[in-house]
Each structure stands twice: as structure tokens, then as C-alpha cells.
Amino acid sequence: MRFVYHPLAKEPTLKIEGESYIHLYRSRRIKSASRLDLRNLKDGFLYTYEHAEIAKKHALLRLVGVQPLEIMANKKTHLILSVIEIKNIEKILPFLNQLGVSKLSLFYADFSQRNEKIDSAKLERFQKILIHSCEQCGRSVLMELEAFSNTKEALKAYPKASVLDFNGETLPASADFEKGVIIGPEGGFSEQERGYFKEREIYRIPLDMVLKSESACVFVASIAQI
């Protein structure tokens, strides 16, 4: 663990309780003499705290140091992924986070699984997964998450995003990944959706194999950092 997340990190004093307390003081057995590095995952600063008190159900921390320390990928990457199974989204989130993806937009394509609902509770769970990933890899800013109800909404929001499809030019490392790369579901895009893409750059993955949506995400995120 590179640091501990706390939404109020930077305050002169902090209280650690609940799941964080159990993890730090019962699982990891942090001692009172230890100092802890904390982040709020918003401002890029690393805050160092010492212990003022460790009680049975909470710990009180006192701020003793601050340093600017941003840890992010060199290039920004925005993936626009059609909704796939929730368990598969949760599985790839830590990988995308470690590869420096700056934003993940989810949308319901024509062939998306409609029984998979992306609501505020799901987005909150996704964010929790990302927080744990940041604590492990050291990333200093959270990945942005959002959801759209259909393809046209996503296209309207990102008019310069390119599309990953079977028929297109080989995806170059020089592509503008910050503008967004649209990745379809397992069944690909419908003919109607392909009609929406006529004015956009279309790319394909330079492999003879057909990748799952989650594999395509990891591939694009990796290429973006070359």
C-alpha cells in the first residue's frame, strides 16, 4: 500500500474508523509510532500524519507534513465502453487505473446486455474499487466515471471520439486517445450505429484474433502510453 485514502486528507486532524480502521489497525497492525501517508485523490498532494491516539474503534491523526507529489500516466486516455457484464467491468477497472486511463465512459449500445444496470450505487462501487487500486499502485488522482443511456448520447457528448471496429485502419500509438476511443460490446456495433460513425476515425486492433471488450480496453490503454 503506497498511501491511505481519506476524503478529508489535508485537515489538521483526522479520525480513522470503520473499514479503514479495521484494515489498518487489526489487519495490518499499524503501531502508534508509525507515520501514515494519506491522499484525498483530488489535489495531488501527499499528506503525512502521526498518531495522536489509537482507541479500540478509532484512531486520531495529526498532520505533520505536506508535499506535492502527482503520480499519473504521461498521456491522458479516455475510453468510451459499451456496457458489458458488471463483473467484467469490475475486473478490468484496476488494470485500466494502473495503465493511467483518465476517464471511463459507459454507454448502452444496441447490442449491450440491457439486464446490466449502471446506477449510482454501481458507480459508487466502481469508485471504491478504483480507490483501492490507487492505494496499491500510488496513482494520485481518481479516474473519472460516467454513464450514458445510449450510443447517440455518448456520441453527442464526445463528437471527436474515434471508434474501434473490425473495419478500419490499424490503431496507431499516435492516435489522440484523450478525445476518446469508443469500444463496442461482444456482438459488435449494429448497422445503425455504424451509420452514426461515418464522419469519425475508425480503427482496428492489429491482431487476427477477435478480442473481448474488456481485452480491447486493456489493449487500447496500453497502446496509448507508448
Curated annotation (Swiss-Prot):
GO molecular function terms attached to this record: rRNA (uridine-N3-)-methyltransferase activity
Bilayer-spanning residue ranges: none
Entry's localization field: Cytoplasm
GO cellular component, one term: cytoplasm
This protein's UniProt keywords: Cytoplasm, Methyltransferase, rRNA processing, S-adenosyl-L-methionine, Transferase
Keyword set includes Ion transport: no
EC number: 2.1.1.193
Pfam family, one: PUA_4
CDD domains: RsmE-like
GO BP, sorted A to Z: rRNA base methylation
Reaction equation(s) it catalyzes: uridine(1498) in 16S rRNA + S-adenosyl-L-methionine = N(3)-methyluridine(1498) in 16S rRNA + S-adenosyl-L-homocysteine + H(+)
Family: Belongs to the RNA methyltransferase RsmE family.
Function, as annotated: Specifically methylates the N3 position of the uracil ring of uridine 1498 (m3U1498) in 16S rRNA. Acts on the fully assembled 30S ribosomal subunit.
NCBIfam families: PRK11713.3-3 (NF008695), RsmE family RNA methyltransferase (TIGR00046)
Protein name (database record): Ribosomal RNA small subunit methyltransferase E
